[in-house]
């Protein structure tokens, strides 16, 4: 474990293996005034992200940086355990490829689950493409999103769907991050009126126009990527984030519905594990980390070859009641494509049915991620590992799809 100290807060990092860029990002966060008083804990899968660190957990009060939650609001895994003890991977692949759009594709007609959410309730509804969003429920996306069939040592079969809020989450996150920076670099109406009244009181009426011109913008107290919302914007962001989180859940459930119906599966257990959100009941932000409350069932995926950890939370307050959301990358996507070959990728996936191994998914190969031992050895204080489920089928859309 490492302890990092910034100007306004400190952080515990629950691993000894951390790259310099991640450390720099964490310290930059700890140097922001709105982090003062927060309990910041970094998960063992910590790695640098776009402006902020993946694997972040922190308590919040009345201010939040939208970028800390990120653009894929509500992203997570939907997991089901089947009554069936045998599946046909070729048929499953056909059902997925014919019934679940992936990559940048959306549905030609909305899934029936689209009726379960009203996007007009978004505070920023005029800033998002709601028609595209409704047609995106039941779509996988690309990158590290996946659909897997896994088996445990007792022969139980699980289906796991990993996806999030698609383009809707991106639009909401970008809107509020821009609004945050604009609010921090703009003088309020009250500040402008106070300046005018002061100039009048001082007999400096002739200077009013020049002063107003100089008050068009002010220096932000924080870097743009870490700009925060507060007050009414804070409440609006939380409201819209919860809708995006609901949207992401419906998206995963719609895909699972397509799979279960298409395959004729019988579900005997189902649970959700979310990793980009704010737990508003406990006011804990989790970016690339998951809830691990006492007795809570959760899933930690490792990579395409090694599968996932089925765990039960221990409710450890020192960990912010959290656990890592995965193994964490060893290298960037571009570096992975330079370091490995498709031939190596295919060898690593031997014994797992997949039609998704190729140049476009090379950045997602098992070798690009930390190993299972790197995570299992660090999470004992926060979860109990109940089982390791191994992939028998995997589907991913590449970055060129």
Enumerate the predicted regions with their spans.
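Acidic, glycine-rich active-site loops and adjacent beta-strand->loop/helix elements
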Residues: 46-47, 75
């Amino acid at each position: 474990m490492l302890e990092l100290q910034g100007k306004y807060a400190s952080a515990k990092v629950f691993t000894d293996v951390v790259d310099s860029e991640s450390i720099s990002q964490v310290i930059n966060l700890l140097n922001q005034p709105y982090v003062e008083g927060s309990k910041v804990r970094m998960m063992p899968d910590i790695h640098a992200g776009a402006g902020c660190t993946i694997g972040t957990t922190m308590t919040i009060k009345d201010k939040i940086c939208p970028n800390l939650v990120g653009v894929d609001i509500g992203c997570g895994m939907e997991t089901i355990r089947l009554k069936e003890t045998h599946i046909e991977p070729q048929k499953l692949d056909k059902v997925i490829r014919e019934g679940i759009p992936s990559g940048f594709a959306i549905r030609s007609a909305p899934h029936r689950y689209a009726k379960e959410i009203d996007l007009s309730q978004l505070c920023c509804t005029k800033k998002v493409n709601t028609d595209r969003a409704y047609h995106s429920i039941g779509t996988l996306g690309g990158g590290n999103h996946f659909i897997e069939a896994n088996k445990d040592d007792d022969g139980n079969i699980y289906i796991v769907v990993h996806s999030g809020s698609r383009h809707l989450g991106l639009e909401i996150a970008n809107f509020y991050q821009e609004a945050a920076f604009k609010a921090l670099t703009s003088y309020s109406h009250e500040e402008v009126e106070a300046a005018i009244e002061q100039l009048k009181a001082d007999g400096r009426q002739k200077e009013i126009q020049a002063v107003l011109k100089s008050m068009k913008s002010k220096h932000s107290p924080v870097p743009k990527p870490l700009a925060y919302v507060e007050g009414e914007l804070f409440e609006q962001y939380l409201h819209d984030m919860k809708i995006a989180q609901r949207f992401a859940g419906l998206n995963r459930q719609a895909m699972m519905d397509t799979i279960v119906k298409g395959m004729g599966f019988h579900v005997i257990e189902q649970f959700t594990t979310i990793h980009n959100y704010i737990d508003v009941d406990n006011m804990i932000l989790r970016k690339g980390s998951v809830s691990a409350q006492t007795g809570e069932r959760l899933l930690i995926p490792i990579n395409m070859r090694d599968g996932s950890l089925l765990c039960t939370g221990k409710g450890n307050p020192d960990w912010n009641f959290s656990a890592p959301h995965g193994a964490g990358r060893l290298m960037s996507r571009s570096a992975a494509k330079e370091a490995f070959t498709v031939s190596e990728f295919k060898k690593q996936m031997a014994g797992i049915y997949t039609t998704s191994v190729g140049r476009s998914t090379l950045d997602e190969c098992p070798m690009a991620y930390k190993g299972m031992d790197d995570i299992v050895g660090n999470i004992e204080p926060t979860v109990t590992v109940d089982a390791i489920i191994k992939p028998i089928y995997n589907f991913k859309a590449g970055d060129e799809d």
